[in-house]
Amino acid sequence: MTQTRAVGITGTPGTGKKSVSRLLAPKLHRELLELNALAASQSVQDDFGELAVDVNALGRDIRGRRLSGAVVSGHLLADVLKASDVDFVAVLRCDPAVLKRRLSSRGYAHEKVLENVEAELIGVVLDAAVRRFGPSKVHEYDTSRTKPASVARKIELDLRSGLPQTAPWRDWTLGYDSSTRLRSLLSAPRTDPAST
């Protein structure tokens, strides 16, 4: 393997970045840098009680570390790294209905669940990665029904092969046979007294 720059792992929250990257880094004998952990140590709370990340400061911090050869994981990857920082970017994708169940089971607020499901449905993270790093560096992996170890192995094989992305990008909207199913996926449960 000739890669000397970083390998990026990104995706919408809940797609398996942490699990996959923690399995992949040792397979590749590379250091793992988790953007969320680094961001949490630098973040401040905004007026709404959410953590606000200074992506420019995070980018400087990550580049000040041993970025070369590392596996860098996080949904902010395209906001923090430059195209010249990476040789390969794995975008983890997940069927929005599966993602909704995953995030709900983790205790995410319903509003956050819907925000992330919508982002996955329309491919926000994939689009950002392709725009930032270029389509030849970006590879897409469906984690909906695949174990993290299998995803890590597939990424390892693709990385070692050196082949560019060849499959067309996934469009989750094609998997929903009606606008009713799409609306139901993106709607909040009714909480008014009439619904109980």
Go through the PLM ranges and name each one.
Residues 12:
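P-loop (Walker A) phosphate-binding loop of NTP-binding proteins
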Residues 31-81, 168, 173-178:
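ATP-dependent small-molecule kinase phosphotransfer cores
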Residues 93-139, 145, 160-163:
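A glycine- and Lys/Arg-enriched "phosphate-lid" helix/loop adjacent to the NTP-binding pocket
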